[in-house]
């Protein structure tokens, strides 16, 4: 967990403690957020490209959308 930022570690602790809801379809959750980031014209092109690249890699390597 040390390699992740403070906000991620905080949310992790909240989910683990039951204070924040757990999402069983974690890959779907990640892809939804990455898609939202990649499509958001208010964000920098660099951030959008990073999100698109991460989502595409996830789709190629791990995820099957049925």
UniProtKB/Swiss-Prot annotation:
Domain of life the protein comes from: Bacteria
InterPro entries (UniProt xref): UPF0253 (IPR009624)
UniProt xrefs under Pfam families: UPF0253 (PF06786)
Family: Belongs to the UPF0253 family.
NCBIfam families, alphabetized: PRK04964.1
HAMAP family found in the cross-reference section: UPF0253 (MF_01064)
Protein name: UPF0253 protein CKO_03176
